[in-house]
């Protein structure tokens, strides 16, 4: 089957690599003139690694990633609240540089099949084909089109004109440092406070990925102008680990993005066009499942196309992925609302509830991620 993938991000490259493995004629179209990745660290859950094992993609990610055993949650006063145990039942979770993950995925797609400077402007469908039109004048026809063109997807906007990114109410800064803290190498740490959150996550070779989130207006000019000294001043009352990480951060290399998600869609399929990853179900990063859910989409779609006729495969993909990713979006949104509250009373209640909850009970709240259907 001749298949086009729109977008060469994590979801698009995973889908292309898997479909190439299973014998399809695949082309990836990327609007940019390069494949450089902007990002810091990314989490890959055990649910995702399990899904990839049958296609021999998991091994390289496990080798290049850092095992993550536990995420400890503390208050901004360094008070222990709870811990999410990650590697239960021998389920491996890893963290990895986004650009390293991207390079791994890229090796599974023939170089000549990734076409840069191809910005999609329009598509037209017949019952059994899709014709694509690009800004550079190229036109091509395919049996199936996979839209993995991100949260601001041109394809999704064409299918659902009213589906636009929904601002979550907070902005996020991120970076990577080489700094030794009083942490186990497989242990992450999050501080939840009145002024926001600060997370510290291990990467391979003693590097640390850090992030912080602060409540803000959309496109807030105050935070757009933030540099290292501003972050140091903002978090100067947070525990010493936070200050050490920010001190270690280079002046350059700090990323800032406002956080968005999508209102869950009723369908990811329109004829022979299928949405995948952020184009279908962009979520806030509170569960660390953005990249993972895109990869799960790709695995599920590949499994189904291998076992069924195209119409049946797309119907099944639509049914199981819309249901599962809706739960992820809403759960992540709920976590963000609780974690980002600046109300003294709500923080007091939240912290008290977290301390009362057992670690096992906390882990059970995300156990549904392990039960995703992949075909």
Where does each model-flagged region fall?
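Short, flexible helix/strand-to-coil boundary loops that buttress conserved ligand/catalytic motifs
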Residues: 39, 55-56, 65, 84-85, ...
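Conserved N-terminal helical subregion
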Residues: 3, 20, 45-174, 219-232, ...
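Alpha-helical membrane-targeting segments
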Residues: 330, 334-375
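Conserved mid-domain beta->alpha element of the FAD-binding
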Residues: 5-21, 27-32, 146-147, 173, ...
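Short beta-strand or tight-loop elements
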Residues: 1, 116, 128, 194-196, ...
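Conserved FAD/dinucleotide-binding core of flavoprotein oxidoreductases
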Residues: 82-102, 136-138, 179-254
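Histidine-centered metal-chelating micro-motifs
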Residues: 152-153, 172-174, 196-199, 280-281
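Conserved N-terminal glycine-rich FAD pyrophosphate-binding loop of Rossmann-like flavoproteins
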Residues: 34-50
């Amino acid at each position: 089957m001749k298949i086009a993938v729109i977008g060469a991000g994590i979801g698009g490259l995973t889908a292309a690599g898997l479909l190439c493995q299973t014998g399809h004629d695949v082309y990836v179209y990327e609007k940019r003139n390069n494949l450089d990745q902007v990002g810091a660290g990314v989490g890959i859950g055990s649910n995702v690694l399990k899904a990839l094992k049958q296609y021999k993609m998991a091994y390289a990610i496990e080798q290049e990633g850092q095992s993550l055993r536990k995420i400890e949650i503390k208050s901004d006063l360094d008070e222990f609240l709870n811990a999410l145990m990650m590697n239960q039942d021998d389920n491996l979770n890893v963290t990895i540089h986004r650009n390293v993950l991207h390079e791994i995925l890229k090796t599974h797609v023939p170089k000549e099949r990734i076409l840069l400077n191809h910005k999609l402007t329009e598509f037209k469908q017949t019952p059994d084909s899709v014709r694509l039109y690009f800004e550079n004048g190229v036109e091509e026809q395919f049996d199936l089109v996979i839209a993995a063109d991100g949260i601001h997807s041109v394809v999704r906007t064409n299918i659902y004109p009213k589906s636009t990114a929904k601002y979550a109410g907070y902005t996020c800064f991120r970076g990577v440092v080489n700094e030794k803290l009083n942490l186990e190498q497989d242990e992450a740490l999050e501080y939840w406070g009145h002024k926001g959150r600060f997370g510290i996550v291990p990467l391979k070779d003693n590097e640390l990925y850090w992030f912080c989130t602060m409540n803000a207006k959309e496109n807030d000019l105050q935070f757009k102008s933030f540099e290292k000294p501003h972050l140091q001043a903002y978090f100067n009352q947070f525990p010493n680990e936070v200050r050490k990480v920010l001190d270690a951060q280079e002046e350059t290399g700090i990323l800032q993005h406002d956080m968005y998600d999508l209102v869950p869609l009723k369908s990811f399929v329109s004829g022979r066009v299928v949405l995948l990853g952020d184009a279908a179900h962009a979520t806030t990063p509170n569960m660390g499942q953005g990249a993972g859910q895109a990869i799960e989409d790709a695995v599920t779609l590949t499994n189904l196309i291998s076992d069924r006729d195209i119409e049946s495969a797309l119907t099944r993909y639509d049914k199981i992925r819309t249901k599962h990713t809706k739960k992820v979006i809403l759960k992540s949104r709920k976590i963000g609302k609780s974690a980002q509250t600046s109300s003294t009373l709500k923080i007091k209640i939240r912290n008290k509830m977290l301390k009362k909850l057992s670690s096992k009970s906390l882990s059970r709240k995300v156990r549904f991620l392990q039960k995703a259907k992949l075909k």
